[in-house]
Design a protein with these regions (language model features):
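Short, contiguous alpha-helical
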Residues: 4-65, 107-165
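Helix-adjacent hinge/juxtasegments
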Residues: 59-100
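Exposed alpha-helical structural elements
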Residues: 2, 49-50, 74, 85, ...
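Glycine- and aromatic-rich loop/turn segments at beta-sheet edges
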Residues: 26, 98-103
Length: 165
């Protein structure tokens, strides 16, 4: 499986959501604004945990979210670092790399094993799920939300796909 476009899309979708969310952040009720940041921060922490596991390095977090809620700019910085790492990694990964099995401990202490390919698929689906939750907060407040679809990303990236459809 070629993950390159999927992780480029993930990075694009994260930036789209943060851009639109940040523009309207002051309009959100405090509880919803906090949820918006914390649910996206959760995905960023989980990305970081699995990146550490892929690299065989110590994990930077002891939970699946941080105690303190980051600012949107702090969240954006960490999210972009993770997304950039993932885009670079999948661009260079071989089929053998993707089949490699990683053993690790989940945050709750249970042990687990996943192939790199399974980890990457988890990060894609997990991130999409929680972007949807954050986007729902915008919708519930009658605010603009991104059109977070892979098809939109592909057609924006390659406008020639619209010709002759």
């Amino acid at each position: 499986m070629d993950f390159s476009k999927a992780f480029q899309y993930k990075k694009w979708a994260n930036n789209e959501l943060l851009d639109i969310g940040e523009q309207q952040f002051s309009i959100l009720p405090e509880r919803d604004a906090t949820f918006f940041v914390r649910i996206l921060n959760h995905t960023t922490v989980v990305d970081s945990l699995f990146i550490s596991r892929i690299m065989g390095e110590p994990e930077k977090y002891s939970g699946d979210n941080t105690v303190e809620t980051p600012t949107i700019s702090e969240l954006r910085e960490t999210m972009n670092q993770n997304d950039s790492w993932l885009v670079q990694y999948v661009g260079a990964a071989t089929k053998e790399d993707l089949k490699r099995v990683v053993s690790f401990k989940f945050i709750d202490g249970d042990t687990g094993q996943m192939s790199i390919e399974e980890i990457l698929l988890h990060l894609l689906t997990h991130g999409s799920n929680h972007r949807g939750m954050a986007s729902r907060v915008l919708a519930e407040n009658n605010l603009e939300r991104p059109k977070d679809t892979f098809t939109r990303y592909l057609h924006q990236l390659e406008p020639s796909r619209r010709v002759g459809g």
